[in-house]
Amino acid sequence: MVDGLVGSEMCIRDRFNAKLYAASQTFDEARHVEAFNRYIQTRLKMMYPIGNALKSILDKILTDPRWDLKFIGMQLIIEGLALAAFQSTRELAKDPVLYDMLGLIIRDEARHVTFGVNYLEEFVSTLSEEEKNDRAQFAYEACLLSRERLLSTDVFEYFGWDVEEARQFQLGSDLIQHFQ
């Protein structure tokens, strides 16, 4: 994921400061991956690969040839989802290590989203209505895909559970209700 972030953000046209920010953000993301990896390995001792829903969102974003849609997808959608998920998890965290770690990561993620909003605000003002509608449709479709990323259907299948029954149960859970 970090490689995709670097590649998509280095496509930022002719903005040296934006490229420097993207490099800094890439460092942040690598630090986040390492923090989560260490936390999961030492505290939970169980790790699952990236889920199909999140993978499909990333594939949609990173395979689009237009730099601005990659930027919208990564800076607003993925970073926004991460920010919301980390905030919800932090509110419910009982482990003080996780709570503190998420506080630091949330600070970074909020900065990343703010950068995306500020950078795109200027760019979007140069687009035609048709181009704006195309970007809005892209973002909408990515958001539709993102709904499913909270549902651990890959895990349900792994344990041999009825996927639809487990999905409906999870949709009614306090965590999902809190996140929404």
Region spans (language model):
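Conserved alpha-helical segments that form or flank metal/cofactor-binding pockets of metalloenzymes
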Residues: 26-49, 116-121
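Alpha-helical scaffold segments that form or flank carboxylate-/histidine-based iron centers
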Residues: 14-31, 65-71, 96-109, 135-137
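Extended, helix-rich structural scaffolds rather than catalytic motifs
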Residues: 129-180
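Inter-helical turn/loop segments and adjacent helix faces that build the functional surface
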Residues: 13-18, 43-44, 86-104, 118-134, ...
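Acidic/His metal-coordination segments adjacent to aromatic residues that form catalytic metal sites
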Residues: 52-76, 92-93, 141-160
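Single conserved hydrophobic/aromatic residue that forms the stacking wall/gate
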Residues: 1-7, 11-12
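Alpha-helical membrane segments in multi-pass integral membrane proteins
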Residues: 75-83, 99-116
